[in-house]
Every structure is written in structure tokens, then in C-alpha cells.
């Protein structure tokens, strides 16, 4: 096995593009990505705006609670989220891929900081 082959070829790329389901894989990835990005943009902007500009009871505590969820490793939440998706009957659906990622604490924090900097 060599690190750099003498005669490089694009044959593997051609084989992948000829595969029947490859376009479906790309479409699935695109669909999930667009839904998650749009959901994050909409919901995180609303939550970030509320934390930045509105006054309500428990604002600091709630924001600290949201930020503290960023300290929980993703590996710890994978099995409980899977069990929840199984209870909902969402296994092998787009909902199971998109709903858990629609709002993320990092995006809430990022958009809160952005809205606070607006005049």
C-alpha cells in the first residue's frame, strides 16, 4: 500500500456517482441540514432576543440552566434521546433527526450576545 499512487484515478468517484441510491443520500443530507439550520435560525433568534431585550422573572437562572446543558457531553444524551424517539415512534424518520437539533444552547448564547450588541 502506497501513500501516493503513481497513476491517480477518479474511478472510485465515478462508481459512487453511478450508484442508484447516492442521489437519495445527498437529498436526505440536504433536507435534514436545511431543516435544522432554518429551525435553529428561527427558534434560537427568538430565544436569544428574549434573553437579550426582555425582562422577566428568573431570566438569569434560566439562561444559566440553558448554558449548563452545554457541559453535558453528547455521548451521555444519545441513548436517552434514542429511547425517547422510540417511544414517539419516530425511528427511521426525519423527525428523529431534526427535532432534537432544532434549538441548541450554543446558538441561543451566540444570538443573545449578537442581539445585545445591536444599538
Each model region followed by its residue ranges:
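A structural signal for multi-pass alpha-helical bundles of membrane permease subunits
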Residues: 1-119
Amino acid at each position: 500500500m502506497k501513500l501516493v499512487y503513481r497513476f491517480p484515478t477518479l474511478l472510485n468517484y465515478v462508481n459512487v456517482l453511478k450508484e442508484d441510491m447516492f442521489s437519495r443520500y445527498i437529498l436526505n443530507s440536504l433536507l435534514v441540514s436545511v431543516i435544522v439550520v432554518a429551525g435553529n435560525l428561527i427558534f434560537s433568534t427568538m430565544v436569544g432576543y428574549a434573553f437579550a431585550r426582555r425582562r422577566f422573572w428568573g431570566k438569569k437562572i434560566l439562561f444559566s440552566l440553558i448554558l449548563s446543558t452545554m457541559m453535558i457531553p453528547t455521548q451521555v444524551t444519545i441513548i436517552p434521546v434514542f429511547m425517547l424517539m422510540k417511544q414517539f415512534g419516530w425511528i427511521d424518520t426525519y423527525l428523529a433527526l431534526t427535532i432534537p437539533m432544532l434549538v441548541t444552547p450554543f446558538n441561543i448564547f451566540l444570538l443573545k450576545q449578537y442581539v445585545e450588541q445591536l444599538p
